[in-house]
Protein backbone atom coordinates (compact mmCIF):
# COMPACT_ATOMS: atom_id res chain seq x y z
CA UNK A 1 0.00 0.00 0.00
CA UNK A 2 1.29 3.46 -0.92
CA UNK A 3 1.89 6.08 1.78
CA UNK A 4 2.48 9.17 -0.31
CA UNK A 5 2.13 12.55 1.40
CA UNK A 6 -0.94 14.68 0.71
CA UNK A 7 1.14 17.85 0.34
CA UNK A 8 4.33 18.43 -1.63
CA UNK A 9 6.07 20.79 0.75
CA UNK A 10 9.77 20.19 0.07
CA UNK A 11 11.74 22.48 -2.25
CA UNK A 12 14.60 19.98 -2.12
CA UNK A 13 12.28 17.29 -3.46
CA UNK A 14 11.42 19.43 -6.48
CA UNK A 15 15.05 20.39 -7.08
CA UNK A 16 16.19 16.75 -6.95
CA UNK A 17 13.43 15.71 -9.36
CA UNK A 18 14.35 18.54 -11.73
CA UNK A 19 18.05 17.61 -11.57
CA UNK A 20 17.26 13.98 -12.41
CA UNK A 21 15.08 14.94 -15.37
CA UNK A 22 17.75 17.35 -16.61
CA UNK A 23 20.17 14.42 -16.53
CA UNK A 24 17.81 12.30 -18.61
CA UNK A 25 17.11 15.09 -21.10
CA UNK A 26 20.86 15.53 -21.61
CA UNK A 27 21.21 11.79 -22.20
CA UNK A 28 18.44 11.66 -24.77
CA UNK A 29 19.71 14.78 -26.56
CA UNK A 30 23.11 13.10 -26.98
CA UNK A 31 21.40 9.85 -27.99
CA UNK A 32 19.54 11.61 -30.79
CA UNK A 33 22.69 13.44 -31.87
CA UNK A 34 24.24 10.06 -32.68
CA UNK A 35 21.35 9.35 -35.06
CA UNK A 36 21.94 12.69 -36.79
CA UNK A 37 25.62 11.82 -37.14
CA UNK A 38 24.70 8.37 -38.47
CA UNK A 39 22.90 9.93 -41.44
CA UNK A 40 25.89 12.13 -42.27
CA UNK A 41 28.36 9.26 -41.95
CA UNK A 42 26.16 6.97 -44.04
CA UNK A 43 25.97 9.58 -46.79
CA UNK A 44 29.75 10.02 -46.66
CA UNK A 45 30.43 6.27 -46.59
CA UNK A 46 32.36 6.67 -43.33
CA UNK A 47 31.88 3.09 -42.12
CA UNK A 48 34.54 3.20 -39.40
CA UNK A 49 32.97 6.40 -38.11
CA UNK A 50 29.57 4.71 -37.99
CA UNK A 51 31.02 1.82 -36.01
CA UNK A 52 32.66 4.23 -33.57
CA UNK A 53 29.54 6.26 -32.78
CA UNK A 54 27.61 3.01 -32.37
CA UNK A 55 30.15 1.83 -29.78
CA UNK A 56 30.28 5.20 -28.04
CA UNK A 57 26.50 5.41 -27.73
CA UNK A 58 26.30 2.23 -25.65
CA UNK A 59 28.17 3.97 -22.81
CA UNK A 60 26.03 7.13 -22.85
CA UNK A 61 23.36 5.91 -20.44
CA UNK A 62 25.64 4.78 -17.63
CA UNK A 63 27.71 7.96 -18.00
CA UNK A 64 24.63 10.16 -17.49
CA UNK A 65 23.39 8.04 -14.57
CA UNK A 66 26.81 8.34 -12.94
CA UNK A 67 26.92 12.07 -13.63
CA UNK A 68 23.45 12.67 -12.15
CA UNK A 69 24.24 10.57 -9.08
CA UNK A 70 27.39 12.59 -8.38
CA UNK A 71 25.47 15.88 -8.66
CA UNK A 72 22.77 14.65 -6.28
CA UNK A 73 25.33 13.39 -3.78
CA UNK A 74 27.38 16.59 -3.90
CA UNK A 75 24.53 19.09 -3.83
CA UNK A 76 21.80 17.30 -1.84
CA UNK A 77 23.53 14.52 0.14
CA UNK A 78 21.07 12.23 -1.66
CA UNK A 79 22.03 9.05 0.18
CA UNK A 80 20.75 10.55 3.44
CA UNK A 81 17.51 12.08 2.14
CA UNK A 82 14.56 11.00 4.30
CA UNK A 83 11.90 8.58 3.08
CA UNK A 84 9.17 11.23 3.01
CA UNK A 85 11.30 13.44 0.76
CA UNK A 86 12.04 10.54 -1.62
CA UNK A 87 8.29 10.00 -1.95
CA UNK A 88 7.84 13.68 -2.80
CA UNK A 89 10.72 13.49 -5.30
CA UNK A 90 8.88 10.78 -7.20
CA UNK A 91 5.61 12.74 -7.24
CA UNK A 92 7.34 15.90 -8.47
CA UNK A 93 9.05 13.83 -11.17
CA UNK A 94 5.69 12.45 -12.31
CA UNK A 95 4.38 16.00 -12.56
CA UNK A 96 7.36 17.06 -14.66
CA UNK A 97 6.69 14.18 -17.08
CA UNK A 98 3.07 15.14 -17.82
CA UNK A 99 3.80 16.50 -21.32
CA UNK A 100 7.15 14.80 -21.84
CA UNK A 101 7.74 12.94 -25.13
CA UNK A 102 9.85 10.13 -23.61
CA UNK A 103 8.18 9.54 -20.21
CA UNK A 104 8.82 5.79 -20.09
CA UNK A 105 12.54 6.29 -20.71
CA UNK A 106 12.70 9.07 -18.12
CA UNK A 107 11.05 6.81 -15.52
CA UNK A 108 13.66 4.13 -16.17
CA UNK A 109 16.41 6.74 -15.82
CA UNK A 110 14.91 7.78 -12.46
CA UNK A 111 15.03 4.14 -11.32
CA UNK A 112 18.67 3.81 -12.40
CA UNK A 113 19.76 6.91 -10.49
CA UNK A 114 17.72 5.99 -7.42
CA UNK A 115 19.04 2.43 -7.22
CA UNK A 116 22.59 3.66 -7.75
CA UNK A 117 22.31 6.01 -4.77
CA UNK A 118 20.39 3.72 -2.43
CA UNK A 119 21.31 0.15 -1.46
CA UNK A 120 18.82 -2.46 -2.64
CA UNK A 121 17.86 -3.29 0.95
CA UNK A 122 16.90 0.34 1.55
CA UNK A 123 14.93 1.65 -1.42
CA UNK A 124 11.37 0.42 -1.71
CA UNK A 125 8.67 0.38 -4.34
CA UNK A 126 7.32 3.76 -3.21
CA UNK A 127 10.60 5.35 -4.32
CA UNK A 128 10.88 3.91 -7.84
CA UNK A 129 8.66 3.19 -10.85
CA UNK A 130 7.72 -0.48 -10.57
CA UNK A 131 4.97 0.17 -13.13
CA UNK A 132 4.63 3.09 -15.56
CA UNK A 133 3.06 6.20 -14.06
CA UNK A 134 2.65 8.14 -17.32
CA UNK A 135 0.81 6.69 -20.30
CA UNK A 136 2.60 6.61 -23.64
CA UNK A 137 -0.63 6.30 -25.62
CA UNK A 138 -1.30 8.93 -28.28
CA UNK A 139 1.70 11.13 -27.54
CA UNK A 140 1.98 13.54 -30.48
CA UNK A 141 4.76 15.86 -31.58
CA UNK A 142 2.61 19.00 -31.45
CA UNK A 143 5.66 21.29 -31.36
CA UNK A 144 6.80 20.08 -34.81
CA UNK A 145 3.77 18.88 -36.82
CA UNK A 146 5.95 18.64 -39.94
CA UNK A 147 7.89 15.80 -38.22
CA UNK A 148 5.20 13.20 -37.50
CA UNK A 149 6.12 9.72 -36.31
CA UNK A 150 5.08 8.31 -39.69
CA UNK A 151 3.92 9.62 -43.04
CA UNK A 152 0.95 8.27 -45.00
CA UNK A 153 0.90 7.86 -48.80
CA UNK A 154 -2.05 6.95 -51.02
CA UNK A 155 -0.83 5.24 -54.20
CA UNK A 156 -4.31 4.15 -55.31
CA UNK A 157 -5.74 7.65 -55.30
CA UNK A 158 -2.78 9.83 -56.31
CA UNK A 159 0.50 9.01 -57.93
CA UNK A 160 0.37 5.30 -58.52
CA UNK A 161 2.83 2.92 -56.96
CA UNK A 162 5.98 4.06 -58.75
CA UNK A 163 5.44 7.75 -58.04
CA UNK A 164 4.46 6.90 -54.46
CA UNK A 165 7.67 5.00 -53.72
CA UNK A 166 9.74 7.68 -55.43
CA UNK A 167 8.17 10.29 -53.15
CA UNK A 168 8.81 8.08 -50.10
CA UNK A 169 12.52 7.86 -50.93
CA UNK A 170 12.89 11.58 -51.71
CA UNK A 171 11.24 12.56 -48.41
CA UNK A 172 14.26 11.21 -46.51
CA UNK A 173 16.40 13.88 -48.23
CA UNK A 174 19.56 11.84 -48.60
CA UNK A 175 22.37 14.04 -49.91
CA UNK A 176 24.20 11.32 -51.84
CA UNK A 177 22.79 10.73 -55.35
CA UNK A 178 21.18 7.47 -56.44
CA UNK A 179 22.72 5.31 -59.12
CA UNK A 180 19.38 4.83 -60.93
CA UNK A 181 16.38 5.47 -58.72
CA UNK A 182 13.85 4.92 -61.51
CA UNK A 183 15.28 1.45 -62.12
CA UNK A 184 15.24 0.58 -58.42
CA UNK A 185 11.69 1.91 -57.93
CA UNK A 186 10.68 -0.29 -60.84
CA UNK A 187 12.17 -3.28 -59.03
CA UNK A 188 10.28 -2.37 -55.84
CA UNK A 189 6.96 -2.10 -57.70
CA UNK A 190 7.64 -5.35 -59.52
CA UNK A 191 8.47 -7.18 -56.27
CA UNK A 192 5.36 -5.79 -54.55
CA UNK A 193 3.22 -6.95 -57.46
CA UNK A 194 4.76 -10.43 -57.41
CA UNK A 195 4.29 -10.72 -53.65
CA UNK A 196 0.63 -9.67 -53.47
CA UNK A 197 -0.60 -11.09 -56.76
CA UNK A 198 -4.31 -10.61 -57.45
CA UNK A 199 -5.11 -8.57 -54.37
CA UNK A 200 -8.28 -6.48 -54.48
CA UNK A 201 -7.53 -2.85 -53.70
CA UNK A 202 -9.61 -1.59 -50.77
CA UNK A 203 -10.70 2.05 -50.38
CA UNK A 204 -8.20 2.53 -47.53
CA UNK A 205 -5.20 1.22 -49.51
CA UNK A 206 -2.18 3.20 -48.27
CA UNK A 207 1.49 3.03 -47.31
CA UNK A 208 2.91 4.33 -44.02
CA UNK A 209 6.62 4.87 -43.45
CA UNK A 210 8.32 5.89 -40.21
CA UNK A 211 9.77 9.38 -40.58
CA UNK A 212 13.38 8.47 -39.72
CA UNK A 213 15.74 6.07 -41.43
CA UNK A 214 17.10 3.09 -39.48
CA UNK A 215 20.91 2.95 -39.72
CA UNK A 216 22.96 -0.20 -39.07
CA UNK A 217 26.15 -1.66 -40.54
CA UNK A 218 26.46 -0.11 -44.02
CA UNK A 219 22.72 0.23 -44.67
CA UNK A 220 19.89 2.68 -44.12
CA UNK A 221 16.44 1.09 -43.89
CA UNK A 222 13.06 2.58 -44.75
CA UNK A 223 10.60 0.88 -42.39
CA UNK A 224 6.86 0.97 -43.02
CA UNK A 225 3.63 -0.92 -43.55
CA UNK A 226 1.06 -1.40 -46.29
CA UNK A 227 -2.61 -1.18 -45.30
CA UNK A 228 -5.35 -2.71 -47.40
CA UNK A 229 -8.77 -3.35 -45.94
CA UNK A 230 -8.35 -4.92 -42.52
CA UNK A 231 -4.91 -6.33 -43.30
CA UNK A 232 -1.48 -4.87 -42.53
CA UNK A 233 1.71 -5.94 -44.29
CA UNK A 234 5.28 -5.04 -43.25
CA UNK A 235 7.59 -3.08 -45.52
CA UNK A 236 11.35 -2.56 -45.33
CA UNK A 237 13.62 -1.15 -48.05
CA UNK A 238 17.39 -1.22 -47.43
CA UNK A 239 19.42 1.54 -49.06
CA UNK A 240 23.09 0.74 -49.76
CA UNK A 241 26.10 2.25 -51.46
CA UNK A 242 26.33 0.48 -54.82
CA UNK A 243 29.54 -0.49 -56.66
CA UNK A 244 29.49 2.91 -58.37
CA UNK A 245 29.59 4.67 -54.99
CA UNK A 246 26.05 5.97 -55.49
CA UNK A 247 22.97 4.81 -53.59
CA UNK A 248 20.80 1.85 -54.56
CA UNK A 249 17.63 0.25 -53.23
CA UNK A 250 18.87 -3.27 -52.52
CA UNK A 251 15.54 -5.08 -52.09
CA UNK A 252 12.10 -4.79 -50.53
CA UNK A 253 11.11 -7.01 -47.59
CA UNK A 254 7.39 -7.74 -47.31
CA UNK A 255 7.12 -10.75 -44.97
CA UNK A 256 6.78 -10.69 -41.18
CA UNK A 257 9.49 -13.35 -40.90
CA UNK A 258 11.92 -11.11 -42.79
CA UNK A 259 11.21 -8.20 -40.44
CA UNK A 260 11.62 -10.43 -37.38
CA UNK A 261 15.09 -11.43 -38.60
CA UNK A 262 15.92 -7.79 -39.41
CA UNK A 263 15.05 -6.84 -35.81
CA UNK A 264 16.54 -10.01 -34.30
CA UNK A 265 18.40 -10.09 -30.97
CA UNK A 266 21.43 -11.31 -32.95
CA UNK A 267 21.97 -7.95 -34.66
CA UNK A 268 23.48 -4.72 -33.43
CA UNK A 269 21.16 -1.94 -32.36
CA UNK A 270 19.76 0.47 -34.93
CA UNK A 271 20.52 4.18 -34.86
CA UNK A 272 17.20 6.01 -35.31
CA UNK A 273 16.21 9.59 -34.58
CA UNK A 274 12.99 9.33 -32.54
CA UNK A 275 11.22 12.23 -30.88
CA UNK A 276 8.58 9.85 -29.50
CA UNK A 277 10.14 6.38 -29.12
CA UNK A 278 6.96 4.79 -27.75
CA UNK A 279 5.18 5.68 -31.01
CA UNK A 280 7.92 3.94 -32.99
CA UNK A 281 7.57 0.86 -30.79
CA UNK A 282 3.78 0.83 -31.26
CA UNK A 283 4.23 1.08 -35.04
CA UNK A 284 6.77 -1.75 -35.08
CA UNK A 285 4.56 -3.93 -32.88
CA UNK A 286 1.82 -3.52 -35.47
CA UNK A 287 3.99 -5.16 -38.13
CA UNK A 288 5.68 -7.61 -35.71
CA UNK A 289 2.94 -8.49 -33.19
CA UNK A 290 4.92 -11.47 -31.82
CA UNK A 291 7.89 -9.29 -30.93
CA UNK A 292 8.01 -8.31 -27.23
CA UNK A 293 8.16 -4.58 -26.58
CA UNK A 294 11.33 -5.17 -24.56
CA UNK A 295 13.12 -6.54 -27.63
CA UNK A 296 11.89 -3.71 -29.85
CA UNK A 297 13.15 -1.03 -27.46
CA UNK A 298 16.48 -2.85 -27.28
CA UNK A 299 16.80 -3.12 -31.07
CA UNK A 300 16.28 0.67 -31.26
CA UNK A 301 19.33 1.21 -29.05
CA UNK A 302 17.26 1.82 -25.91
CA UNK A 303 18.66 -1.25 -24.18
CA UNK A 304 18.07 0.02 -20.62
CA UNK A 305 14.37 0.40 -21.37
CA UNK A 306 14.47 -3.07 -22.90
CA UNK A 307 16.04 -4.43 -19.71
CA UNK A 308 13.42 -2.70 -17.59
CA UNK A 309 10.51 -4.10 -19.62
CA UNK A 310 12.09 -7.54 -19.78
CA UNK A 311 12.36 -7.65 -15.99
CA UNK A 312 8.72 -6.57 -15.61
CA UNK A 313 7.66 -9.28 -18.07
CA UNK A 314 9.80 -11.79 -16.18
CA UNK A 315 8.23 -10.93 -12.81
CA UNK A 316 4.78 -11.19 -14.39
CA UNK A 317 5.64 -14.62 -15.75
CA UNK A 318 6.94 -15.75 -12.36
CA UNK A 319 3.71 -14.67 -10.74
CA UNK A 320 1.64 -16.66 -13.23
CA UNK A 321 3.72 -19.86 -13.37
CA UNK A 322 4.71 -22.55 -10.90
CA UNK A 323 7.54 -24.57 -12.51
CA UNK A 324 11.03 -24.49 -11.03
CA UNK A 325 14.34 -23.16 -12.27
CA UNK A 326 16.59 -26.08 -13.20
CA UNK A 327 20.12 -26.66 -14.42
CA UNK A 328 19.99 -26.19 -18.19
CA UNK A 329 20.02 -29.52 -20.07
CA UNK A 330 23.04 -30.35 -22.22
CA UNK A 331 26.79 -30.38 -21.79
CA UNK A 332 27.94 -28.44 -18.72
CA UNK A 333 30.15 -25.44 -19.46
CA UNK A 334 33.53 -24.91 -17.82
CA UNK A 335 33.04 -21.16 -17.37
CA UNK A 336 29.32 -20.63 -16.91
CA UNK A 337 26.72 -22.20 -14.66
CA UNK A 338 23.61 -22.15 -16.84
CA UNK A 339 20.05 -22.53 -15.59
CA UNK A 340 16.61 -22.03 -17.07
CA UNK A 341 12.90 -21.94 -16.32
CA UNK A 342 11.30 -24.47 -18.70
CA UNK A 343 8.19 -22.32 -19.19
CA UNK A 344 10.25 -19.24 -20.11
CA UNK A 345 12.24 -19.00 -23.40
CA UNK A 346 15.50 -17.73 -21.88
CA UNK A 347 18.61 -19.08 -20.17
CA UNK A 348 20.44 -17.54 -17.21
CA UNK A 349 24.25 -17.66 -17.16
CA UNK A 350 26.39 -17.11 -14.06
CA UNK A 351 30.20 -17.06 -14.09
CA UNK A 352 31.65 -19.87 -11.98
CA UNK A 353 34.02 -19.16 -9.10
CA UNK A 354 36.68 -21.59 -10.33
CA UNK A 355 37.44 -22.66 -13.90
CA UNK A 356 38.73 -26.22 -14.31
CA UNK A 357 41.52 -27.01 -16.77
CA UNK A 358 42.08 -26.37 -19.61
CA UNK A 359 40.32 -23.00 -19.10
CA UNK A 360 42.66 -20.18 -18.13
CA UNK A 361 40.63 -17.04 -17.52
CA UNK A 362 39.21 -14.78 -14.81
CA UNK A 363 35.79 -13.40 -13.96
CA UNK A 364 36.78 -9.91 -15.10
CA UNK A 365 38.19 -11.21 -18.37
CA UNK A 366 34.97 -13.12 -19.11
CA UNK A 367 32.91 -10.00 -18.38
CA UNK A 368 35.15 -7.99 -20.70
CA UNK A 369 34.49 -10.50 -23.52
CA UNK A 370 30.73 -10.12 -23.07
CA UNK A 371 31.11 -6.34 -23.09
CA UNK A 372 33.14 -6.61 -26.30
CA UNK A 373 30.23 -8.44 -27.94
CA UNK A 374 27.81 -5.79 -26.70
CA UNK A 375 29.86 -3.07 -28.38
CA UNK A 376 30.78 -4.96 -31.55
CA UNK A 377 28.81 -5.49 -34.73
CA UNK A 378 27.07 -8.83 -34.10
CA UNK A 379 26.18 -9.22 -37.82
CA UNK A 380 23.20 -11.46 -37.02
CA UNK A 381 25.46 -14.22 -35.69
CA UNK A 382 25.94 -13.46 -31.97
CA UNK A 383 23.16 -13.46 -29.39
CA UNK A 384 22.59 -10.29 -27.42
CA UNK A 385 22.72 -10.60 -23.63
CA UNK A 386 20.91 -8.81 -20.85
CA UNK A 387 23.16 -8.20 -17.85
CA UNK A 388 21.72 -7.84 -14.35
CA UNK A 389 23.11 -7.49 -10.84
CA UNK A 390 21.57 -8.53 -7.50
CA UNK A 391 18.52 -10.33 -8.90
CA UNK A 392 16.29 -11.84 -6.21
CA UNK A 393 14.51 -15.12 -7.00
CA UNK A 394 12.05 -16.97 -4.73
CA UNK A 395 14.11 -19.79 -3.23
CA UNK A 396 11.07 -22.08 -3.41
CA UNK A 397 11.23 -21.87 -7.23
CA UNK A 398 14.81 -23.20 -7.37
CA UNK A 399 15.23 -26.94 -7.88
CA UNK A 400 17.39 -28.50 -5.15
CA UNK A 401 19.92 -29.72 -7.72
CA UNK A 402 20.31 -26.15 -8.99
CA UNK A 403 20.90 -24.82 -5.48
CA UNK A 404 23.59 -27.48 -4.99
CA UNK A 405 25.21 -26.43 -8.30
CA UNK A 406 25.39 -22.84 -7.08
CA UNK A 407 26.77 -23.77 -3.67
CA UNK A 408 29.39 -26.03 -5.24
CA UNK A 409 30.47 -24.01 -8.29
CA UNK A 410 29.49 -20.36 -7.68
CA UNK A 411 28.95 -19.80 -3.94
CA UNK A 412 30.33 -16.26 -4.10
CA UNK A 413 27.61 -15.32 -6.59
CA UNK A 414 24.64 -15.98 -4.29
CA UNK A 415 23.31 -14.91 -0.95
CA UNK A 416 20.08 -15.64 0.90
CA UNK A 417 17.71 -13.05 2.30
CA UNK A 418 14.24 -12.71 3.76
CA UNK A 419 11.67 -11.34 1.30
CA UNK A 420 9.16 -8.67 2.30
CA UNK A 421 6.39 -11.27 2.26
CA UNK A 422 8.36 -13.37 4.76
CA UNK A 423 9.54 -15.97 2.26
CA UNK A 424 13.15 -16.82 1.48
CA UNK A 425 14.94 -15.42 -1.56
CA UNK A 426 18.16 -16.33 -3.30
CA UNK A 427 19.96 -13.27 -4.66
CA UNK A 428 22.19 -13.83 -7.70
CA UNK A 429 24.85 -11.13 -7.69
CA UNK A 430 25.55 -11.12 -11.43
CA UNK A 431 23.76 -12.88 -14.29
CA UNK A 432 23.56 -12.80 -18.08
CA UNK A 433 20.24 -13.65 -19.74
CA UNK A 434 20.01 -14.89 -23.33
CA UNK A 435 17.35 -16.28 -25.62
CA UNK A 436 17.09 -20.05 -25.37
CA UNK A 437 18.01 -21.84 -28.60
CA UNK A 438 18.45 -25.42 -29.71
CA UNK A 439 22.16 -26.27 -29.23
CA UNK A 440 23.69 -26.97 -32.64
CA UNK A 441 25.30 -30.23 -31.48
CA UNK A 442 21.85 -31.60 -30.55
CA UNK A 443 20.33 -30.23 -33.76
CA UNK A 444 22.98 -32.08 -35.80
CA UNK A 445 22.70 -35.30 -33.78
CA UNK A 446 18.92 -35.55 -33.99
CA UNK A 447 18.26 -33.88 -37.34
CA UNK A 448 17.33 -35.38 -40.68
CA UNK A 449 19.86 -35.39 -43.50
CA UNK A 450 18.34 -32.15 -44.81
CA UNK A 451 18.58 -30.54 -41.37
CA UNK A 452 22.20 -31.63 -41.00
CA UNK A 453 22.96 -30.11 -44.40
CA UNK A 454 21.24 -26.88 -43.39
CA UNK A 455 22.95 -26.78 -39.98
CA UNK A 456 26.42 -27.27 -41.46
CA UNK A 457 25.88 -24.62 -44.16
CA UNK A 458 24.65 -22.18 -41.51
CA UNK A 459 27.52 -22.99 -39.13
CA UNK A 460 30.15 -22.35 -41.80
CA UNK A 461 28.43 -19.17 -42.94
CA UNK A 462 28.18 -17.97 -39.33
CA UNK A 463 31.91 -18.44 -38.71
CA UNK A 464 32.84 -16.78 -42.01
CA UNK A 465 30.60 -13.79 -41.27
CA UNK A 466 32.04 -13.50 -37.76
CA UNK A 467 35.64 -13.48 -38.94
CA UNK A 468 34.70 -11.00 -41.67
CA UNK A 469 33.50 -8.80 -38.79
CA UNK A 470 36.85 -9.33 -37.00
CA UNK A 471 35.57 -11.85 -34.43
CA UNK A 472 37.38 -15.16 -33.91
CA UNK A 473 35.06 -17.33 -31.76
CA UNK A 474 37.87 -19.23 -30.05
CA UNK A 475 35.96 -22.31 -28.94
CA UNK A 476 34.21 -23.44 -32.11
CA UNK A 477 32.65 -26.67 -30.84
CA UNK A 478 29.09 -27.16 -32.07
CA UNK A 479 27.76 -27.00 -28.50
CA UNK A 480 28.69 -23.31 -28.35
CA UNK A 481 26.28 -22.45 -31.16
CA UNK A 482 22.50 -22.44 -31.22
CA UNK A 483 19.78 -22.64 -33.85
CA UNK A 484 17.11 -19.91 -33.71
CA UNK A 485 13.45 -20.46 -34.50
CA UNK A 486 14.17 -19.01 -37.95
CA UNK A 487 16.81 -21.69 -38.59
CA UNK A 488 19.82 -19.38 -38.29
CA UNK A 489 22.95 -20.59 -36.50
CA UNK A 490 24.13 -18.18 -33.81
CA UNK A 491 27.20 -18.12 -31.55
CA UNK A 492 26.57 -17.66 -27.81
CA UNK A 493 29.68 -18.64 -25.82
CA UNK A 494 31.98 -15.63 -25.63
CA UNK A 495 34.66 -16.37 -23.03
CA UNK A 496 37.36 -17.18 -25.64
CA UNK A 497 36.59 -14.70 -28.41
CA UNK A 498 39.38 -12.58 -29.85
CA UNK A 499 39.72 -10.03 -32.61
CA UNK A 500 40.85 -11.90 -35.73
CA UNK A 501 43.39 -9.15 -36.36
CA UNK A 502 45.05 -10.05 -33.03
CA UNK A 503 45.46 -13.70 -34.07
CA UNK A 504 48.37 -15.42 -35.82
CA UNK A 505 47.08 -17.73 -38.55
CA UNK A 506 49.53 -20.58 -39.07
CA UNK A 507 50.04 -23.76 -41.04
CA UNK A 508 50.82 -26.88 -39.03
CA UNK A 509 54.60 -27.37 -39.46
CA UNK A 510 55.83 -30.47 -41.25
CA UNK A 511 57.20 -33.09 -38.80
CA UNK A 512 60.99 -33.22 -38.82
CA UNK A 513 61.28 -36.90 -37.95
CA UNK A 514 59.27 -40.08 -37.45
CA UNK A 515 58.89 -39.48 -33.73
CA UNK A 516 57.17 -36.14 -34.32
CA UNK A 517 55.04 -37.62 -37.10
CA UNK A 518 53.76 -40.44 -34.86
CA UNK A 519 53.35 -38.28 -31.74
CA UNK A 520 49.88 -38.10 -30.22
CA UNK A 521 50.75 -34.76 -28.64
CA UNK A 522 51.30 -31.35 -30.20
CA UNK A 523 55.06 -31.30 -30.78
CA UNK A 524 55.35 -27.81 -32.30
CA UNK A 525 55.35 -24.50 -30.45
CA UNK A 526 51.95 -22.87 -29.93
CA UNK A 527 51.90 -19.28 -28.75
CA UNK A 528 48.93 -17.27 -27.43
CA UNK A 529 46.56 -16.23 -30.25
CA UNK A 530 47.94 -18.84 -32.67
CA UNK A 531 45.29 -20.38 -34.96
CA UNK A 532 45.82 -23.62 -36.91
CA UNK A 533 42.79 -24.04 -39.23
CA UNK A 534 44.03 -27.44 -40.47
CA UNK A 535 43.49 -28.85 -36.95
CA UNK A 536 39.79 -27.91 -36.92
CA UNK A 537 39.02 -31.13 -38.82
CA UNK A 538 39.58 -33.14 -35.64
CA UNK A 539 36.59 -31.79 -33.74
CA UNK A 540 34.32 -30.73 -36.63
CA UNK A 541 34.28 -33.75 -38.96
CA UNK A 542 33.83 -36.65 -36.53
CA UNK A 543 30.23 -37.44 -37.48
CA UNK A 544 30.10 -38.94 -41.01
CA UNK A 545 26.96 -37.04 -42.05
CA UNK A 546 28.30 -33.76 -40.69
CA UNK A 547 31.74 -34.32 -42.17
CA UNK A 548 30.42 -35.07 -45.66
CA UNK A 549 28.19 -31.98 -45.64
CA UNK A 550 31.01 -29.83 -44.29
CA UNK A 551 33.43 -30.82 -47.04
CA UNK A 552 30.76 -30.25 -49.68
CA UNK A 553 30.01 -26.68 -48.59
CA UNK A 554 32.96 -25.39 -46.57
CA UNK A 555 36.11 -27.23 -47.66
CA UNK A 556 38.01 -23.92 -47.54
CA UNK A 557 37.32 -23.74 -43.79
CA UNK A 558 40.50 -25.73 -43.07
CA UNK A 559 42.69 -23.67 -45.39
CA UNK A 560 44.75 -21.02 -43.54
CA UNK A 561 44.62 -18.90 -46.70
CA UNK A 562 40.87 -18.32 -46.26
CA UNK A 563 41.37 -17.05 -42.72
CA UNK A 564 44.41 -14.97 -43.67
CA UNK A 565 42.53 -13.30 -46.54
CA UNK A 566 39.88 -12.06 -44.10
CA UNK A 567 42.55 -10.79 -41.71
CA UNK A 568 44.39 -8.99 -44.52
CA UNK A 569 41.21 -7.23 -45.65
CA UNK A 570 40.45 -6.13 -42.10
CA UNK A 571 43.98 -4.79 -41.62
CA UNK A 572 43.58 -2.88 -44.89
CA UNK A 573 40.53 -1.12 -43.41
CA UNK A 574 37.85 -2.99 -45.35
CA UNK A 575 34.37 -3.09 -43.80
CA UNK A 576 32.41 -6.12 -44.97
CA UNK A 577 28.81 -5.98 -46.21
CA UNK A 578 26.36 -8.00 -44.09
CA UNK A 579 22.79 -8.68 -45.10
CA UNK A 580 19.94 -9.53 -42.73
CA UNK A 581 18.10 -11.21 -45.61
CA UNK A 582 18.86 -13.88 -48.19
CA UNK A 583 21.15 -13.02 -51.07
CA UNK A 584 18.44 -14.31 -53.43
CA UNK A 585 16.15 -11.49 -52.24
CA UNK A 586 18.54 -8.79 -53.47
CA UNK A 587 17.42 -7.05 -56.65
CA UNK A 588 20.84 -7.55 -58.23
CA UNK A 589 20.32 -11.32 -58.01
CA UNK A 590 16.55 -11.37 -58.35
CA UNK A 591 16.21 -9.24 -61.46
CA UNK A 592 19.81 -8.72 -62.58
CA UNK A 593 21.70 -5.47 -62.67
CA UNK A 594 20.78 -4.88 -66.31
CA UNK A 595 17.22 -6.25 -66.20
CA UNK A 596 14.55 -3.77 -67.22
CA UNK A 597 11.51 -3.90 -64.93
CA UNK A 598 8.17 -4.06 -66.71
CA UNK A 599 6.23 -0.85 -67.18
CA UNK A 600 3.72 -0.40 -64.36
CA UNK A 601 0.67 1.82 -64.75
CA UNK A 602 -0.59 3.80 -61.74
CA UNK A 603 -3.09 2.02 -59.51
CA UNK A 604 -6.58 3.38 -60.16
CA UNK A 605 -9.31 4.25 -57.67
CA UNK A 606 -11.24 1.17 -56.52
CA UNK A 607 -14.47 0.51 -58.37
CA UNK A 608 -17.05 -2.23 -58.67
CA UNK A 609 -15.01 -4.08 -61.28
CA UNK A 610 -13.07 -7.34 -60.88
CA UNK A 611 -10.13 -7.76 -58.50
CA UNK A 612 -6.96 -6.00 -59.60
CA UNK A 613 -3.32 -6.44 -58.81
CA UNK A 614 -1.54 -4.10 -56.43
CA UNK A 615 0.98 -3.35 -59.14
UniProtKB/Swiss-Prot annotation:
Enumerate the active-site residues: 384
Report the GO molecular function annotations: [isocitrate dehydrogenase (NADP+)] kinase activity; AMP binding; ATP binding; phosphoprotein phosphatase activity; protein serine/threonine kinase activity
- Disulfide bond sites: none
Reactions catalysed:
L-seryl-[isocitrate dehydrogenase] + ATP = O-phospho-L-seryl-[isocitrate dehydrogenase] + ADP + H(+)
Q: Tell me where it mainly resides.
A: cytoplasm
This protein's record includes keyword Metal-binding: no
Write the record's keywords in alphabetical order, separated by commas: ATP-binding, Cytoplasm, Glyoxylate bypass, Hydrolase, Kinase, Nucleotide-binding, Protein phosphatase, Serine/threonine-protein kinase, Transferase, Tricarboxylic acid cycle
Give the region (Disordered) as residue ranges: 595-615
Record-listed ATP binding positions:
328-334, 349
| GO biological process entries | glucose metabolic process; glyoxylate cycle; tricarboxylic acid cycle
Q: What is its EC number?
A: 2.7.11.5, 3.1.3.-
Q: Where in the cell is it found?
A: Cytoplasm
Q: Which domain of life is it from?
A: Bacteria
Q: Which GO terms describe its cellular component?
A: cytoplasm
Q: Entry's HAMAP family?
A: AceK
The entry's family comment says: Belongs to the AceK family.
- What role does it play? Bifunctional enzyme which can phosphorylate or dephosphorylate isocitrate dehydrogenase (IDH) on a specific serine residue. This is a regulatory mechanism which enables bacteria to bypass the Krebs cycle via the glyoxylate shunt in response to the source of carbon. When bacteria are grown on glucose, IDH is fully active and unphosphorylated, but when grown on acetate or ethanol, the activity of IDH declines drastically concomitant with its phosphorylation.
The protein, known as: Isocitrate dehydrogenase kinase/phosphatase
Species assigned in the record: Cupriavidus taiwanensis (strain DSM 17343 / BCRC 17206 / CCUG 44338 / CIP 107171 / LMG 19424 / R1) (Ralstonia taiwanensis (strain LMG 19424))
